[in-house]
Amino acid sequence: MARQPIKTIDPNVDLSSALKLPEELPKPWDAATLFGRSAPLELEIGSGRGLFISNAAGQFPHHNFLGVEIGVKYARYCADLLIRQHRTNAIIVCGDAALVLQHTIPCETLTAVHVYFPDPWWKRAHRKRRVLRPEVLQLIESRLMPGGTLHFWTDVEEYFTSTLHLLAKTTTLQGPFEVPEQEAENEMDYHTHFERRTRLGGEKVYRAMYKKGDNPKEG
């Protein structure tokens, strides 16, 4: 299925309530200041068109959701969607997720990290650009609270198997745990737009969930 072009958001629309730059985030980190309340915090790396973060924020109103999207056009699209759907418990950061994890999010503050259909960077020479590289996986592990979870989905088998190998080699996260495919009754029942396009095209989606132990090993 062909990818539909993303809508350009009017530059005059005020998105400031749902769209931040990394330098606009509280320092030192204070999620209660950012969201106006204290609540369990979930992070999505690469929010794309915003289907997951918008649906999750609506489904779990007692959680806060922070999405990090490096593409300016996509970040603005996500923020506009969150505002239109009144998702006051979700905010998009336009920036590099690795840098946000490293410089802004403290250790053991996230209840979940979601990474759905990241860019596979097909050429072998470009794979070092993948978001789920060893140093980022270690950052994710350190930022998860004990009992926190990592959710990773992709339609690229090589990316899936190599990432699972890296997780086993570079982290102490428990898993992978199987994630069963949920039947979709309508087009909004998919996790992301990419999942919808992949499944409707008859292609396989690879899914895994990992959990941080209550007493994770040091190092």
Kindly give the residue locations of the regions a language model identified:
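Class I S-adenosyl-L-methionine
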Residues: 162-165, 169-219
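Conserved class I S-adenosyl-L-methionine
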Residues: 126, 154-169
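A short acidic, Gly/Pro-enriched loop at the edge of an enzyme's catalytic core
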Residues: 103-112
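Conserved beta-strand signature within the Rossmann-like core of class I S-adenosyl-L-methionine
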Residues: 146-154
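A short glycine-rich, Lys/Arg-flanked "PGG" loop and its adjoining helix->strand segment in the class I
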Residues: 132-146
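S-adenosyl-L-methionine
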Residues: 1-43, 51-58
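Class I S-adenosylmethionine-dependent transferase superfamily signal
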Residues: 113, 140-141, 150, 163
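SAM cofactor-binding core of SAM-dependent methyltransferases
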Residues: 40-99
